[in-house]
Every structure is written in structure tokens, then in C-alpha cells.
Regions:
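Active-site and adjacent substrate-binding regions of carbohydrate-active enzymes
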Residues: 1-532, 538-561
């Protein structure tokens, strides 16, 4: 508790009430003493994460978590050792990220017993939506009713307050008017939408309430805790209100509580920002998040395949450095959100980012924008399935599959823990009808299915879904058998033509896995080190080092020395 108490003093400038401190200490101790589920001590090459909604599949009147559990056991368990269940709580908007009640499971998904049943078959990652809560929540209703004890739970500002320096991830107003019980209007801080009300962590009782949520998730067995939109948690008018020091201290506090209650729990921060700011949430390697999303990877892989050049990807990959052993990257290509562009800024010139946006928009992708402090707007996200991002409308399925598998062979070779979005393992295309129905761009990559529809598609040998599912499942299962892909193993980027990316993942001093990728649409060759023999682990064929290897368009090889 010493670390926890020290952080409380830093966050609240030594004014944290002793009654709150005692309550917090009691809650931590009670949760720790009641916990029976041990966490995995450390990550390894066998860890691959599936990202999915809890209501991804429907089956008559059955709770969707039960349907998912059956599908997972039949089709996914051999590939994925951990499931990230996107928010499965009652919500009012944003497909789960405007939570009405943190402590209950949405009725359509089931209840906590269904979560526990799934947990018998896989480790689980929960979302801790810690920056904001739904305007339909009991907490906000108490606030609007002006009930005693709720006055400072949220942040109100005079509408004339100069907040021009605040970093904005959206084009919606930062302050939203709400009528209070006495008839007055207050303008409330809403970073993401009028329905998502920012919590006021400067109020110690807000912290206590949110720590209760964290402890509940730990008690329910969460192995990974994802801190959603965490960069915006602490607000100080006159600043950018992102990545503030007290925000980092809050993350450190959540980490310290998880370490105290359930050692081995992984804290992962979701900060879709430039790379330098993103990795700042790893702290000193032992005191903040254990993982950060590798947000630069999805747009850089897309950029490389789109233009047939690994130049930018190669330079960035060479700068990643060696993992500390106590922190690592959460690598992914697609998720429930779009492909973020902010993580490209500082890596690619703005002209190249805009060019990529225009090219993909011409092929049917949707673009989301953010407001800048100078009054301009910039593209911040490309909304598209990763399958359609990589390909043109007129491409055939053979080409689609080739590019898609190239991208995922890259994903699975990078240092870190890889994660695959459910729409990717299912080979999904853009859901334009879903966008019309939902009225927002992100619905393009969030389609939900009748379980019978998906199982029929996976049984159809000619369907793209069948081909993607079997090819990607086989690739993941090959990956988890390679000790070279342990997240903590170093990676070396080797010299090559800019159309190629060549990575070496050493296991021992004279043993390495060589990963060679052709990002272009033309055949390429690569000269291996002479006097070396390799084995192609994809087909078990021997490869002699004195003969250049040929790579088909968008082809790749994993060679074991």
C-alpha cells in the first residue's frame, strides 16, 4: 500500500481525505483476500488475442455470450489464448463505450455467470472505460437532480471559458448544455460526444467509485485491463488536457492497485496518439502500463502495401528497440475503431498521409475528422475493414487474400503480443448498410451476425470467409510454435531493397528466424547470407543460402536457420 498511498498524495497534493484513504484500503484488501483466480505470470509467443464484441453472434433468444463461447470453443480456441471482450455493459451509444452501468452485464449478452463460463476456456481482457460515463447513467442523473454528494462528479464550465488549447479528438462541442433540477443550465465537459460525460477525477469520491469498478473487474477475473481513452482523464483548463502528469499518476495508481490485488494482471493503455506520446505510458518499465497499443503499425503496414514500399515501415521498425522484459507492445492491424492517422504524424509527412486518405476514400473508405486548435480540421481516422483497406474494388479474391495474409504475417512477426479483430479472422468486407443504419462511420467495421450465417460461410470452401479463416488460423498456429516470436526477443531490421522488409528474430546466438516480406506487386529476390542453410517453416522445405530466394508479388517467407 505504500506505493498506492504515495500516488494518492501526488495526485491530490496531499489533500486526499483520510476517510477515503481508509475506504480505499479496505476495498483493496477485501478484493485481494477473496481472489482465487491466479494470473499468468508473463507473456510468451503462445499469446495471441482475439478482439470481439460480446454480442458479435446471435442465435435465437440465447444470450450472445453463450453463443460466442460455443463458437470460440469450436473455431477459435486453438488460435487465440485470450479474448478481448469489448464493453459488454448496458450502454446508450458508441457501441458500448458510453456505459450506463459499469457493474452489470448487458441483458442481451447474458450475465456475469456467462462471462465466468467463457473464462473457463480462455483468459479475458475487459474494457475499463475510465474517462467518461453515459448521460443516461444513474451517476449523471444524480448530478442533474442536484442530489447531495454528486455536485463535483462531473466538470461544468462557463461557456465563455477559453478552452481553445484543449486537444480535441472529435469535431463535436467540448461543452454540452444540460438543464439542472433548479432550472439552470450547466455546460458540461464532453470530450467525445454529448452522451459521453467526462468524469471529474479531481473529486476523491469519483476516484473511489472508479477504483470500485476496477476492483470489480479484477474480482470477476479480468486478466488484462484496457484503459479506454485514458489520455484525457485529468483536466486543467489552460493546458492541452491530454497526457497531463496527473493522468500518468492515475494510470500508475491503477497499475499499483492491480499489482496489489491480482499480480500478473496486465494494464494496457489506449492512447491513439503520436508514437512518442503513446509509449510514454510505459513509464519507467515497472510503474505504469505493461503494454501500449502499437498504433503506428496498422497505418504503416497499410501504407507499405498500398505503395509497394517498405521504406517508412523499415525506418520506423528499426527505431522500436528491444523490449524491456517488463513492457511490450500490443500489436494489431484492425480493431472496432478505424485506422488511426495521428500515430503516423511525425513518421510520414502530412502530404503522404493526405494522399493515402484520398486513395482509400476513392475506394470506398470513410474518413473521420478532428478539430485543431487553429480552427482547421484534419483527418484522424480511416474507417474501413482491413481487408478492403488493402485492396481495390476490382481486385479478385486471390489478390485480396494474398495481400491480407502478407499483412498478418507481418503482424505476427513483430515483437509484442499480437491481436486480431474478429472481422479480420472472418474475412469481412465493408458494411455500408450498417453505416446507413447506425449513422456513423465506424459501423463500417462493426457488423454483427446471425451465427448460422457465419457458420454457413465458413463451411463454403469457395467463400472468401472460408479461405481467410483457414489461412489465418493456420498461420497463427504456426506462429505460436516458434520461440523466436516471444514478445521479449529482439528484432533486427536487415538491409534490403525498399520493396522488401527483412526481419531477424534471434532465439540464441547462432539461431534466428528470418522473416522476408515483398510489399510490392512484382516478383522480387533476396540474397541470403552465404554458407547458411534454412528451413522454410511454412512448407518444411530446405533453402540453401547461396541461391537468392524468390518472392512472388506480396509474398513472404519465414526461414529458420
Amino acid at each position: 500500500m505504500e506505493i498506492i498511498n504515495s500516488l494518492l498524495d501526488k495526485i491530490y497534493d496531499s489533500t486526499f481525505p483520510e476517510t477515503c484513504r481508509a475506504r480505499l484500503s479496505d476495498a483493496i484488501r477485501e478484493t485481494r483476500d477473496a481472489l482465487t483466480h491466479p494470473r499468468k505470470a508473463h507473456w510468451d509467443e503462445k499469446d495471441v488475442v482475439l478482439i470481439t464484441y460480446a454480442d458479435q453472434f446471435r442465435e435465437s433468444e440465447a444470450p450472445t455470450l453463450r453463443t460466442f463461447s460455443r463458437f470460440y470453443q469450436q473455431h477459435l480456441q486453438s488460435s487465440f489464448s485470450l479474448v478481448h471482450l469489448l464493453p459488454f455493459f448496458p450502454y446508450s451509444s458508441d457501441d458500448g463505450f458510453s456505459v450506463i452501468d459499469y457493474h452489470h452485464v448487458s441483458a442481451i449478452c447474458g450475465d456475469w455467470s456467462d462471462v465466468a463460463e467463457l473464462h473457463q476456456h480462455t483468459r479475458l481482457m475487459f474494457d475499463f472505460v475510465c474517462n467518461h460515463i453515459s448521460s443516461h447513467s444513474a451517476w449523471f442523473k444524480h448530478y442533474l437532480a442536484m442530489d447531495p454528494g454528486w455536485d463535483d462528479f462531473f466538470i461544468s464550465m462557463p461557456p465563455a471559458t477559453d478552452l481553445s488549447g484543449v486537444t480535441r479528438p472529435r469535431t463535436s462541442p467540448l461543452l454540452t448544455p444540460f438543464e439542472m433540477a433548479d432550472g439552470d443550465t450547466r455546460f458540461i465537459w464532453t470530450t467525445f460526444s454529448a452522451d459521453q460525460i467526462d468524469l471529474n477525477f479531481a473529486n476523491p469520491f469519483v476516484l473511489l467509485s472508479m477504483v470500485d469498478v476496477l476492483l470489480d473487474y479484477l474480482a470477476k477475473g479480468a486478466d488484462y485491463i484496457r484503459l479506454d481513452a485514458v489520455g484525457y482523464m485529468w483536466k486543467t483548463p489552460g493546458t492541452s488536457c491530454i497526457h497531463l502528469e496527473k493522468t500518468h499518476q492515475l494510470v500508475k495508481l491503477f497499475r499499483a492497485i492491480a499489482d496489489e490485488v491480482a499480480p500478473g494482471t496486465v494494464i494496457i493503455t489506449e492512447t491513439n496518439v503520436p508514437h512518442k506520446d503513446n509509449i510514454s505510458y510505459l513509464g519507467n518499465g515497472r510503474d505504469e502500463a505493461q503494454m501500449v497499443y502499437n498504433f503506428s503499425l496498422p497505418p504503416l503496414v497499410l501504407h507499405a502495401i498500398h505503395y509497394g514500399s517498405a521504406r517508412a515501415l523499415k525506418q520506423w521498425a528499426a527505431s522500436l528497440g528491444v523490449g524491456s522484459g517488463t513492457t511490450t507492445f500490443f500489436n494489431f492491424l484492425a480493431s472496432h475503431d478505424g485506422i488511426g492517422l495521428n500515430p503516423l504524424r511525425g513518421i510520414l509527412p502530412e502530404t503522404e498521409i493526405v494522399s493515402l486518405v484520398r486513395d482509400l476514400a476513392a475506394e470506398g473508405a470513410l474518413i473521420s475528422w478532428k478539430n485543431n486548435p487553429d480552427g482547421t480540421a484534419s483527418p484522424y481516422e480511416i474507417n474501413v475493414t482491413y481487408m478492403d483497406a488493402l485492396n481495390k474494388k476490382e481486385d479478385d479474391d486471390d489478390t485480396r487474400l494474398q495481400r491480407f495474409m502478407l499483412a498478418h504475417a507481418l503482424l505476427l512477426a513483430f515483437p509484442g503480443v499480437p491481436a486480431v479483430y474478429v472481422q479480420s479472422i472472418l474475412g469481412s468486407r465493408n458494411d455500408m448498410e450498417g453505416v446507413k443504419v447506425a449513422g456513423h462511420n465506424r459501423a463500417i467495421n462493426r457488423e454483427k451476425y446471425a451465427i448460422s450465417e457465419i457458420e454457413a460461410a465458413l463451411s463454403d470452401r469457395k467463400s472468401l470467409r472460408h479461405r481467410v479463416y483457414h489461412a489465418l488460423s493456420a498461420l497463427i498456429q504456426l506462429r505460436i510454435r516458434q520461440p523466436a516470436f516471444h514478445p521479449d526477443n529482439p528484432m533486427e531490421v536487415l538491409e534490403s531493397d525498399n520493396a522488401l522488409l527483412v526481419l531477424s528474430r534471434p532465439v540464441k546466438k547462432h539461431d534466428a528466424l528470418l522473416c522476408i516480406y515483398n510489399l510490392s506487386g512484382r516478383e522480387m529476390t533476396y540474397s541470403l547470407p552465404e554458407n547458411q542453410r534454412y528451413r522454410n517453416i511454412n512448407n518444411d522445405e530446405r533453402v540453401e543460402g547461396d541461391v537468392p530466394v524468390r518472392l512472388a508479388p506480396w509474398g513472404w517467407l519465414w526461414l529458420k536457420r
